[in-house]
């Protein structure tokens, strides 16, 4: 919700949001009515398409509401800030505002909403006086231009439709939205078809049509075979009178009557900016008065003389009756216009009057004239034939002339053919003279003049009752050198069978004539029966016939079998139509099997009548035949389909969708930056805004030009001339190939005859050879056609490639301009942003860390990403190391940097630094180890050797309740959390595994805590464990200790806590041992065996010395012992349950796995080396010597452990496992930001419930925190202080 300068309480905003739900208010303004004053204020809630005036008192109620489409005008006033609305529903609405800024926000919001619905509207029409010119100028500068707004799909159709639904109170139909977004926009379709939404009500259709009135995307509105209601008709009339982008209006068979046409005529007569190019009103009930009004409107408005190219008024009987002969539509047709398509079939028009009007009007531009089922003349006169001859003499581009069913008299037919003979400028004309009742007289006229009519290429003479005159008529047609397509159906009503056979033989001879240009023949609906076999047999040797229509001749199964034989050898036919021939399933199967060997037939419309009849008797066989026919036709058309679709669809998919999306997103981004920059950005800012607007305008123009380029790439220029030249050239190539094949065949036969004379005398082999030769004879016929297809495919690919390259370059330039504009806007925004100074660094106190050390912690420990990348490249180049080993080496280098930086900071530290500061500096150097926390309840410090025994043991951590120490609330509040990056990088150092000996089926010992222990193989953890002390018995509850769960179901598998770690790694001094006292042994029964091996004293001493910070001299023996120890660790960790995901991490020394010794101040060194530290060293040395003599150690291989340095120094501590973040298990959910440690479970374990808890206690001290205050040292037994089940010392969480 947008913020306003007015103060509106959050409670009131929430109430308004709930009141308007599910609608959302985009702007809330505080206002009041002038007569009531500011004391009784209101809230003006501006939604997307509607405004609500609400009372501020609760409960809310609406004072008034209005749609933005109701706003007829607005008047703005600055002093006082006031707006006056002129609405349809209200006489006048005056509102006052507290400031001018709120008034400008209101004006901008309403103007932007109206602009989306009416894209061509301007601010000057909306804002009227007394609006100040300065305010209007500011609104124009802040209001985005029409070209700079990234348009929604299909020119904002959905926004307009939504606004109209809100205006009329109708529901918004999501199906219309889906169709517009998915079909129309994605496919670039600008044709809005009302038939797609015919299942909606009339009001929904009316709203969708009303949304087209001001839409700039759709160019065509069509409705076919659907009756239109009155509401839809009204909106169509409104759209016709308003839209200047509507180019095609098709209303066919919609039940329209004369009153609709009269009102349509009024709308067209007054719309001088109309872009209508096509008007189709066929199949309606239009009367002569409506047609007269339409003709006058077209003649009155001079715009249609240069725009209207397509007019279809067919199927309206009586619309052009006798009353129209003197005017009406003929007035418009007699004017010079650009009509190219005119269809007046079935309108009772007089052809004589029509040709007279056309001769003085559009005869030069007319290409298609359909005047079928009309009257040639209402009286016998010579004027009509003369008008026809004049029209044919003046036409230049006519390609179709339909006069079917017009009952032409002989003189009219003679005038027609003579006019075509005299006009040498037209060619490839299709003349339809079917059902004209020409009979013998017309046949004689055709025989005399058809040879001279060179413009004719297609002639339809069906159903003219020629009868026996067909003999001479066929001979006359054969003499024509221009006729390529002839239709002679329904003319074979000859009683004499010999005459019929003579006609059919002449037609067959015409088909087989090499000099005859005939390519298509139709004898449909002639009932030839067995006579059709004469024509079918002629198909075996026809040289040029490519299309044959023998439907409706009742040829039966015998004729189908003959057709199948002809198709096996014919390679010229491309189309065969043979429906309504009484063919059964066997006949269909014969044709299907023949098509398996025919690779040239492209089209065979499914014979639906015969298939329906055959399916009733033998459905399985019929289905099989139909599928086989369709598969063969698909195979024959596969090459053409891929060559046609691939170059057309590929550019559209790769360029249009992606580029449009990218441009729209970038335009939106630039628009947002422009709004952020605002108007008061100074002169440089205004220049940047203007440049951004120009860039958006250019980008939108580049998207609008893409469809034009694609259409230009698809439509080849000079296609007809190029095709003619290629056909003539490829015809010569075909002749040469045919001659070559014939010569090759003859040579092959001669050679075979000379080599195998006896084999040629075998009848079967000779017949087989002839079949092979006949099959190969069609190859020369297919070669020119394939070459022609390949030539056009390659030309189309080249055109589309050029178009795509040009389109990509245009879009690239537009995108570059948008990027540059956005960069300039961002630069201006950064210059306007206030400069904030960093706070001064405070002086450091005695116990404070340096800001450099605390703030640059990651830079201190870890290299930058660029340095790591360079090191990776160098390592890979030197050793060819795989990536999994390379990551291990990089981890080792990181640890090396850690120790190097730690040594550097340790050597550079002053000796007189207080202990707390020294500890903080060491923490920074080695990764920030917080002071060890005291255990809960008993006040004892955690042992340093805590956790090693189960680190190498075979058991897994499974319990849900973990034991954790309590923190002091004061300390917890001042703690600083570990940086997240540090915890991430330190989290992959360890891998927890179980020994190989623990694999296999689990015994019942795991589920029964009281079971007897069994012997097991000793591990390195056993070797490092301190020797058992006499007198310390094992308690039954020691296995679980403080970590036992009250739920028995959760004890199916034992789990260790960190308390057991505290007694395994480092030996404590005698004083601390005494303070600790006797403790219950935390080892489980399965881990305490009688056969435990004695731990290595050297290892224990080495570990202890490393924990207290004493460095050791380097030597060969030390290196060997270290390698041996690392090998033991690797061996112990090779097989385990809990594995780390980063297996390439190198093994880390045990030093990194331990806690700090103690947080007690008594254990810390004081200044000057005085304090409890000296006693600790003395006691520890006595204990080591006594234990060494008691065990009887001999001479060692290398130098023994070095004596501790006499100078007191703080013990070096390593990061505690609490802060070492392990790789998180994806099964455990997201990592807790305050608890970095998370053990990864074995994949064999079942999924445990996710544990969530407050931050781990180990994170209680940050880098800059002070040492914890001393806790009481009085021990308390675990029985008196039970552990809290809500926390886990290892980073667990509460029990869910």
From Swiss-Prot:
Is the keyword Cell membrane assigned to this protein? yes
List keywords of the entry alphabetically: Cell membrane, Cell projection, Cytoplasm, Cytoskeleton, Leucine-rich repeat, Membrane, Methylation, Phosphoprotein, Repeat
Please classify the protein's predominant subcellular localization into one broad category. cytoplasm
* A GO BP entry: positive regulation of ruffle assembly
Protein name per Swiss-Prot or TrEMBL: Capping protein, Arp2/3 and myosin-I linker protein 2
Segments of this protein annotated with the region Disordered = 988-1296
Q: Outline the subunit composition.
A: Forms homodimers. Interacts (via C-terminus) with heterodimeric capping protein (CP); the interaction inhibits CP activity and hence promotes actin polymerization at the barbed end of actin filaments.
Give the residue ranges for region: Necessary for localization at the cell membrane.
975-1002
Q: Which GO terms describe its molecular function?
A: phospholipid binding; protein-containing complex binding
Domains as described in the record: The N-terminal leucine-rich repeat (LRR) domain is necessary for localization to vimentin filaments. The C-terminus is necessary for localization to the cell membrane.
* Originating gene: Carmil2
Protein's job = Cell membrane-cytoskeleton-associated protein that plays a role in the regulation of actin polymerization at the barbed end of actin filaments. Prevents F-actin heterodimeric capping protein (CP) activity at the leading edges of migrating cells, and hence generates uncapped barbed ends and enhances actin polymerization. Plays a role in cell protrusion formations; involved in cell polarity, lamellipodial assembly, membrane ruffling and macropinosome formations. Involved as well in cell migration and invadopodia formation during wound healing.
Residues recorded as bearing Phosphoserine in the entry: 1008, 1134, 1203, 1281
- Which Pfam families did the record assign? Carm_PH (PF17888), CARMIL_C (PF16000), LRR_6 (PF13516)
Q: Which residues carry this modification: Omega-N-methylarginine?
A: 1191
Pro residues compositional bias: what residue ranges? 1199-1209, 1267-1285
Which parts of the sequence are annotated with region: Tropomodulin-like?
507-601
Q: Where is the signal peptide?
A: none
Disulfide bridge partners, by residue number: none
Cellular localisation = Cytoplasm; Cytoplasm, Cytoskeleton; Cell membrane; Cell projection, Lamellipodium
- What is the scientific name of the source organism? Mus musculus (Mouse)
